Curated annotation (Swiss-Prot):
This is DNA-directed RNA polymerase subunit omega. SMART domains: RNA_pol_Rpb6 (SM01409). One of its GO terms (biological process) is DNA-templated transcription. The gene is rpoZ. The RNAP catalytic core consists of 2 alpha, 1 beta/beta' and 1 omega subunit. When a sigma factor is associated with the core the holoenzyme is formed, which can initiate transcription. It catalyses: RNA(n) + a ribonucleoside 5'-triphosphate = RNA(n+1) + diphosphate. One of its GO terms (cellular component) is DNA-directed RNA polymerase complex. Coiled coil: none annotated. The lineage of its organism: Bacteria, Pseudomonadati, Campylobacterota, Epsilonproteobacteria, Campylobacterales. It is an enzyme of class 2 (transferase).
Length: 74
């Protein structure tokens, strides 16, 4: 895992959702629920070491989770 600062990760994640911070918050919330229910992280981060929102934001920043993947499950 590279060592991006939290601000850099947040900026990349925000860019992925067209700078819509409300959409980003929703996407993080939905992904945190999935991770909390036992979904495996899509990035190399241990759920026992890192907070679930940090993992979710990293996944979004790296393009591993997109809005359509959450919408399809509803």
């Amino acid at each position: 895992m590279d060592t991006l600062r939290t601000e850099e990760i947040a900026a990349k994640a925000l860019k992925r959702v067209h700078n819509d911070r409300y959409l980003l918050a929703s996407l993080i919330f939905e992904r945190v629920k999935e991770l909390g229910e036992g979904a495996k992280p899509l990035v190399d981060m241990d759920v026992k070491t890192y907070k679930l929102p940090d993992i979710a934001m990293r996944e979004i920043a790296e393009g591993k989770v997109e809005l359509t993947s959450i919408e399809d499950r509803e």
